[in-house]
Amino acid sequence: MQRRQFLHRSSALLAGSFFLPSVLHAAPRPMGVQLFTLFMTLDQDVKGNMQKIADLGYKDIESAFSRVGGFYGMSAMEFSDLNKSLGMNWVSHHVVGAPFKPRPGFDTSKMPRMNNLRDDAQAIVDSLKGTTVKYLVCANIPIGNKSEVTEAVQILTKAGKIANAAGLTLCYHNHDKEFELVDGQKAFDVFSKEIPADLLKFELDLGWATKAGVDPVELFKAQPGRFPLCHIKDFDEGFKNIVPAGSGIVNFKRILDASSIAGMKHYFIEHDMPKDAIESLTIGKKNIGPLL
């Protein structure tokens, strides 16, 4: 890929390069995996599945909730140490913003209660102490009406302060709903304007943003440096199904070429519960790896 391959031959070029895709870099950037990709199988054999991810060459890990609670049945330190032993870096952790409301058909009856930012922000942050995690990510939060968006701002602002005090960075992960008008406003715009950038960054899901008709590059330009993380997610024609990264219609090269504007540091492949997660990650590594 052509990112960070920008030769700085003069001070003028250097001064302007912040707003241009960088095009020269010394080594490929590490690829990561959002473990929700393996939600259906990970808990059955955590060490074995994490070994498979490492064997594919992935280096960064982003965790999410699991069926068995904790960090895939482990303490945070145990999970952090497991990643280290496999040569991987546990970078970030996903949590929900408010009490979890499963979608229809998603059985959570046998799952333990999930902590959320509204009620448990301090406990969540405390649980990550001593691990390699640098980012705490709000995976979703109710934004169905103006009142919910207002409450979301309050929750995220408070959580951002708690995260910062512990040396963590709070990010918000989007779906497509954040870019829809709700009572005359878009939740993404409200979060951007009403929550200071030092309290909230964004993990832009490139697939969902594209599905919403949003140009990620324009988002980067509007808020340079506010997107340290991204989800590399792909869709088929018509956005009916999520497909392995790089095999669908999202123009990842164009987006990733502009990642220096975004301030992007970590890139996580995500494919929501595919039939064969390892196969999807294998395809994603092959397709996206050359772009990094």
Predicted regions and their residues:
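N-terminal pre-domain/capping segments
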Residues: 2-134, 164, 225, 286-292
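Active-site acidic/histidine proton-transfer and metal-coordination neighborhood
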Residues: 10-12, 16, 21, 101-201
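Hydrophobic faces of well-ordered beta-strands that scaffold small-molecule active sites
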Residues: 31-34, 61-63, 90-95, 136-138, ...
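Acidic-and-aromatic substrate-binding clefts and catalytic sites of carbohydrate-active enzymes
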Residues: 38-44, 64-75, 98-102, 113-117, ...
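Alpha-helical scaffolding within the catalytic cores
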Residues: 46-48, 74-79, 119-124, 185-189, ...
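Acidic/histidine-rich catalytic cores of soluble enzymes
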Residues: 60-62, 163-249
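H/E-rich (His + Asp/Glu) clusters that bind or coordinate divalent metals
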Residues: 245-269
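Aromatic-rich peripheral "rim/lid" segments of glycoside hydrolase catalytic domains that contact
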Residues: 273-292
